[in-house]
C-alpha cells in the first residue's frame, strides 16, 4: 500500500482486515509516531513502521480481551475491581469511530467491566470518547479526563459487586 493511499475507510462501505486497520491506525496516529521517533531512528525504521510493529505486538498478547467494532480493534487488559485498561486501533472514519466506541463500551459492560481507562494524547480523542459515552443511555455512565496524566476514564454504568 502506498503512503498516499492510506486513509480511514468507512466500515459501512468496506470492512478492512486487521492488518489494514493497523496500517491505517499507525499512519493516522501522529502523536504515537512522535512518541516512538527516537526508538525508530535507532532501529533505522520510520516512526510509522515502528508504531505499526508495536501495535501488532501489543494486540497479539493472549492475556488481553479483544473486541472489534467496525474498522476499529480494541484490547482490554483486565484488572481487579472490574477495571480495564484499553487500547484502540482505528481504521474507520470519525462518525463510525464514535459508533464503534459506543458499541465497544456496551460490549465491555456486558462482559463485566465497570470502569475503563485509556491513555489519550489528542483532544480530538477526548471529544470522541465523550460523544460515545453520551450515546449510552444509562445515567450512571460518567467520564473523567485527567489532563495532567492524559488518562481518560469512563464508568460503563452502575458499579457492580
Which ranges hold each PLM region?
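Conserved donor-binding loop and adjoining core beta-sheet/short helix segment
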Residues: 59-94, 156
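Short, charged/polar, Gly/Pro-enriched secondary-structure boundary elements
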Residues: 158-161
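Short secondary-structure transition/capping segments
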Residues: 128-130, 150-156
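Short amphipathic alpha-helix that is part of the acyltransferase structural core
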Residues: 1-50
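N-terminal prepro-regions of secreted/extracellular proteins
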Residues: 55-56
